């Protein structure tokens, strides 16, 4: 065999190992803790449980934050019983990492299991067909990791290929899809379980008059887990709901220190610059233009490129209402474009990496309920956007699936 023949043979083998079509979302499952906190009464609970009722002016500020948050309720593992038993969690700056870790290493994979079981049930295939696991959390760090723990909890095969992502932050719902997309498309027959599980036990802390950015986080964050089954070339018995056609990641210019999280003896501290909404809205147009150019124009599919940003569906991480408001204004979006995102923010708060997967699930369900033509609010193309530390933006170009109305 000549060198050219050997090279051609190797190329053929590599091609045979790859899938034919794009990565596809085959099922979605979500889960939340049992404890529900109404946003309207949360300031009273928060300042009472942290013994901070004497901070009357700060409580008024916090109440206004909660009123303007666009949130109706949130779910959290932490409750009065846990917090009273662990008062170090209620101080702003007290050594508490061991307590937080002890909670997170148990509850993060447990909540991930609940979401995964729902996704596997919807998928309808035996869990033995799961070939890969991608797990993401910003809540705690451990070895072996939450991926190992979830593998044990679900009874997955010990040979499942695992990837654990810790400390990524709010953009990571896009990151896990980007990574899982590459895995699914480059491994023929792969079925990837993607899990994001977030618990606020690592960030909960009492109020501080000198760190209002931390107070913003206390007004926004909630607990939740989402799981997705991803694979290319769906079988007849599988029911795809979205295709992943392109993905990218960007560090926005002049954004150093805009969103930071630091793991300390006191837990995970959260720092937020006031101009985060402005930085994101200023750059989002270029991010989308670059994505569309790469996905459509440079790949020979210019005729498929949507005419405008109002001709696509939007799944945007709800970092807070100000981000959504300024992106809407900058991109001149119709009010309904962020409806799915705002619905999830209202019902669950900011669940960090899990949010965009909750929104994806909500969108396909509402599209079917409203008898629209596709899983993407009746439209063919859409974007999923994750915003987080860096300041990083993750972008995934989605194609919806036709619904049998």
UniProtKB/Swiss-Prot annotation:
Record keyword Isomerase present: no
Catalyzed reaction equations: (E)-4-coumaroyl-CoA + 3 malonyl-CoA + 3 H(+) = 2',4,4',6'-tetrahydroxychalcone + 3 CO2 + 4 CoA
Top-level taxon: Eukaryota
GO BP annotations listed: flavonoid biosynthetic process; polyketide biosynthetic process
Keywords, ordered alphabetically: Acyltransferase, Flavonoid biosynthesis, Transferase
The keyword Acyltransferase is assigned to this record: yes
Signal peptide: none
Catalytic residues of the enzyme: 170
EC identifiers of the protein: 2.3.1.74
Group of enzyme by EC: transferase
Protein name stated in the entry: Chalcone synthase
Organism placement in taxonomy: Eukaryota, Viridiplantae, Streptophyta, Embryophyta, Tracheophyta
